[in-house]
Structures are given as C-alpha cells and as structure tokens.
C-alpha cells in the first residue's frame, strides 16, 4: 500500500490539484463552508477550545479556519535569554548537525543544504557545521509560524519546485523531498549568527505567506527569486522571539538551519517524533559572551 501511495505522489498533477484546493479553500460558501469545517474538526480531532474563535460559524472561508489565531496566552513564550523556542505546533521529523553540506531526511536519505537554500552558495556556507531541525505540521495543527529567537530579516528567496506531500511516509521514500518541493527561504541575522527559516510547500498547501510580504505563493513560477532587506535603519524588519513570521494554508513543514555553535544542546525531550508546541523550549543556546 505504501508503494501505491508513493507512486500516486509522482503521478498526480500536484500543482493543479493544490491550486484547485486553494480556490475552494478561499471561497466563502456560507453553510457549506461551515459544514466542511465541522467535518474537518471532527475528522482530525481539533481542539477548538484553544482557538480565539471557537465556533465554526465564525470563519467565512476554509482558509480563515486553517490560519485561525489562538487565544491570547494559550502558548506562553519561554522568555529565558538562553532558550530558543519551538516556532510551530507540530512534530519533530529530524534534527542534528549539518555535515559537509548534507542534511539528514530519513533512513537512507540525505539532501543538500545548498539545494534547499535555492543554490545560494554564500548562504549555504554560513550554516556549514551548524545544526538543522525539521518540523512537520499536520492538518490538525495551528498553522502560524513564529520566531524561535529574535532576528532581523536580511534575505528572502522563493524556490520553485514540486509539491509532494511532506508527511512521514513521503519523507521516508521520496529522495531529497524538502529540497525538491516549492519553498520560501527567509534568512535572519541574530545574536547567534544567521538563522534560516525554510517554509516548505506540499500537496494541497494553498499558499505560503510571510508577515512582511504577504502571499509569496501562489502564483508559482519556474525561476528563483531573491529579495534583500536592510538590517539597520527605519526599514529594517526585526521580529521578536515568539512573534509571528508567516503561515501555511494547510499543513506543511518548516526546516530551520542554525549557525555553527549557536546551539549548545536541544532541550529535554526534543527528538524525532516528539510533539512540539509553539513557545516551549526547543534548544539551549551557547553562551556567546564566552565564545571567544
């Protein structure tokens, strides 16, 4: 059965299907939309008591529901200076060191950090010898993405690609999955060095958005596009730890890359398949004052 599912991933018109779902998800169909949301809540056992708007009728479209806000304070941010926090609700897929420009995907599969970052060689060099973490957001999860630490945006890259599903099954069987799919790469300058937040698209993910540029995709393209941003002055975009930086319309995956020696250890319990909750401790940071 797994082989059949993977074969279908290669055969399906994934971009066409995703854009069709996107149009349906954006439509405001009144009672029909409400019925679909109620079905989704029941099917995926979503805890709506955490949502700022807990009633399905409050959402005009499926997209409004997917990108729902949480109640204030429901995800308290760990404010300790030496702690990096989880950026999303989801589950850890993999994490570990970046060795020789390679990132571990699943047993038997690695992929290139250079390819992941849209073949931006200078960016890839900045993360050599550092660490990575891949977090999967299931359809049931909260779909907004937050900053793990404070950072100032320096660059954003749109990388065209496939739209394979990014669930654990495809991660085990599709080589180079996260470096093949359409993605948006945001690079931030932090006190610990560069931080890359890679928002990976997937089958029926209707769009990827950021708080500073709005919807990045759709429309999709065939070329890599890069935007550079000032890191000082009144136009600099600085986001605090725990502040929203983007969102998915439907679940997907976030890959984070960290500079060498930015992370001391991952927090207790942070390991593959561990459930993540935005704002909780993700990693213990190196003491930069004694780095010399």
From Swiss-Prot:
Q: Where in the cell is it found?
A: Cell membrane
Q: Which residues carry this modification: Pyruvic acid (Ser)?
A: 252
Spell out the GO cellular component terms annotated for this protein, sorted alphabetically and separated by semicolons.
Answer: plasma membrane
Q: Give site residues, Cleavage (non-hydrolytic).
A: 251-252
EC number(s) from the headed UniProt entry: 4.1.1.65
Catalytic reactions of this protein = a 1,2-diacyl-sn-glycero-3-phospho-L-serine + H(+) = a 1,2-diacyl-sn-glycero-3-phosphoethanolamine + CO2
A Gene Ontology molecular function term of the record: phosphatidylserine decarboxylase activity
Q: Which domain of life is it from?
A: Bacteria
- Residue ranges spanning the membrane: these are none
Q: Cite the annotated pathway.
A: Phospholipid metabolism; phosphatidylethanolamine biosynthesis; phosphatidylethanolamine from CDP-diacylglycerol: step 2/2
UniProt KW keywords: Cell membrane, Decarboxylase, Lipid biosynthesis, Lipid metabolism, Lyase, Membrane, Phospholipid biosynthesis, Phospholipid metabolism, Pyruvate, Zymogen
The record's function comment reads: Catalyzes the formation of phosphatidylethanolamine (PtdEtn) from phosphatidylserine (PtdSer).
Q: How does it assemble?
A: Heterodimer of a large membrane-associated beta subunit and a small pyruvoyl-containing alpha subunit.
Among NCBIfam families, the record links this protein to:
PS_decarb
Q: What is this protein called?
A: Phosphatidylserine decarboxylase proenzyme
